Amino acid sequence: MQKLSLVWIITLSVSVITGDGLSILSCNKTDEVPTVTQCFKSCSDTILGEQVKVSILSQEDPTSIVVGRCIWRIMKQSFTETWTFSRLISAKEITWEPATTQECNGAFHNLCKNKAGCVSEDLEIEPEFSWARTEIREVKHLSIETLTMSAYLHQGAGKVLIDGVAVPISKKTHNNGDFTYVWDDVPISEVCPWKHPISHLSCYKDKEDLDDIYCPSQGISLVNYTKVDTSCPEQIYTDVGGLVFKLGKVDFNDWYPYVIESSDVAVKETISSINMALKMRESVHCHQDCLEIRRRVTYVDGFYYDPLPPAKCRLIGNCSVDSGSVTCNNGTLVWATCGGRRVWIDLKSGRDVKNAVCEKGGRSRISKNQFEGVLNEFHLNNSKFGNILRANEIHSVILKDNEVMDFARVVKSASERSGNFSEGTLINVRQLFRPMINFLRGIEHEIKVVAFSVLALIVGYIIIRIRTVTVAKAKSLESIAMI
């Protein structure tokens, strides 16, 4: 009986560690890279603080609302044709500007017709060359995509969750500094949209800042989370990553198995021994990770630090795909749902992409089997994470086996084109010397420079020789005249 109890304890511990959905990192550039000593210190401070249960809530939306997300995409590129007829093209320079509510509303209603799954086509710059001249071309177009968001009722008023912020539906617009969101007012169901937890985590409050919560087994940190006022019977919270959860008292432990109480002293001692062994194992793994802090992603004090390039990251868990998900750029990007909000996931880096750019024709639909293959590639590409992302097992893809995702509708949006020209000499000799120009254009630029330089030296030498001979003849004639 004692053996059965012990086996059940260990099995439960392992099953709780693997969570639902894919986990990714959301990162910002930083110069703040912890030292190995600071990392070692965090290993001993991991489990200090009050224990608390975090229940991750599923997005069972009785009411969903179609939201348009807009931003101006500005692309600049220079095209140079040298005096040797070589053509040089610079790298694309892409910047972003916020769109106004009026601009976004126009695209939302006129182009996307208030429907989900709409995305604007990215415009490209058409090359244009002039001899001995550099031309700078710029294309600016309004990028819009529509997605569904969670809507809920609170005190008789509808709210929509956008990037972890509860916005009144009656406002019909929101700007987070980068993107502009617009939507139409819709009637809201009175049913609580968050009733059934996806999973329960055993977590710890920070010993110094009780408002920060860390979940070691999942590698999740809940920092600067806020209350969401809803009609739900229990208090709901959301963090900056859009994760929706509730807090409660711990009735289990998913990191160290304190799940069975027994009057048998031997069983209690065995459980205590297992706990100590697991603590030692976690400590050893933590210290080993610290030694690799300059070479791979490392978890320190609630954040992940990626050394190449230096970035400070937060873990976003419970990402999954559904019938609204698509892939982009040959499967490199996946349009997924993370904590109730839509994000682009870069499967090569394991991070979210705030301003993703799909190549022309690069957006495609995907089946469940295809996505599982993409997911396997994700795990292979992100082996550098080591053991820190232990919640990246996907247990259920919402698609059925033979179901295919709807292909996103591509629309053309408002655009502006302009051309600015640098100083140069413009000589239209193309039509006259077209065959010779085409021949020269096929030669490497460096070879042409050398050839033209040698030719210039030869011509210069000939001119000097002619001048020398001319001067000598003139002097000879002067001498004859004097005689």
Curated annotation (Swiss-Prot):
Residue intervals passing through the bilayer: 443-463
CC terms in the record's Gene Ontology section: membrane; viral envelope; virion membrane
Main location group: virion
Subcellular location, record wording: Virion membrane
Post-translational note: Glycosylatedby host. Glycosylation is crucial for glycoprotein export at the cell surface.
UniProt keyword annotation of tRNA-binding present: no
Keyword field: Glycoprotein, Host-virus interaction, Membrane, Signal, Transmembrane, Transmembrane helix, Viral attachment to host cell, Viral envelope protein, Virion, Virus entry into host cell
Virion surface topological segments: 22-442
Membrane topology: Single-pass type I membrane protein
Intravirion side: 464-483
Signal sequence interval, chain numbering: 1-21
Biological process per Gene Ontology, one example term: virion attachment to host cell
Subunit structure of this chain's protein: Homotrimer. Interacts with matrix protein.
Family: Belongs to the cytorhabdovirus glycoprotein family.
Functional note: Attaches the virus to host cellular receptor, inducing endocytosis of the virion. In the endosome, the acidic pH induces conformational changes in the glycoprotein trimer, which trigger fusion between virus and cell membrane.
Name under which the protein is recorded: Glycoprotein
